[in-house]
């Protein structure tokens, strides 16, 4: 399912993720979710929410939190899920931010072991748009990686961990060289954390 603009309201996200999707999966299913747009970080806690088309940074009731997304995925009888987030992030306005507050990406709790998070921008800042690629910089590098560039060991299969590692490196390099500032993606779970979800094949070429 593809949700865009006026068809990407909070009610649409709820309907697709919490009502439609559970009817489509079984224990062998791998779910892929990509969200591109804006997000908001709670100033006091660092909790991250996605902003559907009908929301603003102050309309808390129309935001869709990463915690809610994780919980909806954890309830599914699936093998694994890969979540790709290309978000420009801002703090909730009108509230005093704690010193050094950072987005809370590490989602604790049930289902953590079967969800791979590929986050395009780990800090509170605008994510870069790549004009030449007509996508956000992170999304462009993800697509390039899926096209074969992320096959780091040249075995014809791209794993989720390979894809995120490749994309992170390319975004870091391009942001520094072309824009003069940082945009650092994040992969959760990270390398060496023993998570099987990092070994999930996301593309094959033979």
Where are these regions (language model features)?
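Cysteine endopeptidase catalytic domains of the caspase/legumain-like
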Residues: 1-206
């Amino acid at each position: 399912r593809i949700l865009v603009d006026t068809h990407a309201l909070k009610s649409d996200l709820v309907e697709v993720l919490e009502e439609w999707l559970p009817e489509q999966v079984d224990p062998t299913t791998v779910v892929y979710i990509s969200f591109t747009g804006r997000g908001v970080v709670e100033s006091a806690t660092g909790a991250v929410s996605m902003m559907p088309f009908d929301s603003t940074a102050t309309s808390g009731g129309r935001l869709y939190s990463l915690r809610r997304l994780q919980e909806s995925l954890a309830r599914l009888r699936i093998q694994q899920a890969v979540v790709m987030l290309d978000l420009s992030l801002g703090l909730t306005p009108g509230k005093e931010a704690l010193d050094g507050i950072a987005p809370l990406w590490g989602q604790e709790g049930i289902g953590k072991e079967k969800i791979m998070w590929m986050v395009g921008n780990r800090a509170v800042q605008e994510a870069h748009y790549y004009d030449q690629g007509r996508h956000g910089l992170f999304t462009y590098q993800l697509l390039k990686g899926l096209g074969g560039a992320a096959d780091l060991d040249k075995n014809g299969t791209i794993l989720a961990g390979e894809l995120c590692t490749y994309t992170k490196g390319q975004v870091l390099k391009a942001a520094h060289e072309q824009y003069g500032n940082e945009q650092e993606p994040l992969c959760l779970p990270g390398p060496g954390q023993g998570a099987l979800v990092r070994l999930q094949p996301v593309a094959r070429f033979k």
